[in-house]
Amino acid sequence: MKNTLFRINELSKKEKATGLTVDEKQEQQMLRQNYTQTFRGSLDSILLNTKIVDQNGLNVTPAALQDAQIRLKLSK
């Protein structure tokens, strides 16, 4: 993922400085799309394994998140 982000930034700098070729522009779009999918997947994984508890020890996880967690457990 670090290499992908490095390449995205490298292409962005080049785009600002001199512009990109058609191939580089396609590569940039593909890298950004892949990076976004990976990032969202990681965030989903983190959220689906999160439980929110108030200072009294009560589970205050939002209902929508609890529903998603239940659906995930049922699909496994």
From Swiss-Prot:
InterPro entries documented for this protein: DUF896
Gene3D superfamilies on file: Helix hairpin bin
Entry GO terms, CC: cytoplasm
Similarity comment: Belongs to the UPF0291 family.
Coiled coil ranges: none
One Pfam match: DUF896
UniProt keyword list: Cytoplasm
Source organism (scientific name): Bacillus anthracis
UniProt name for this protein: UPF0291 protein BA_1897/GBAA_1897/BAS1759
Compartments it resides in: Cytoplasm
PANTHER family: UPF0291 PROTEIN BC_1827 (PTHR37300:SF2), UPF0291 PROTEIN CBO2609/CLC_2481 (PTHR37300)
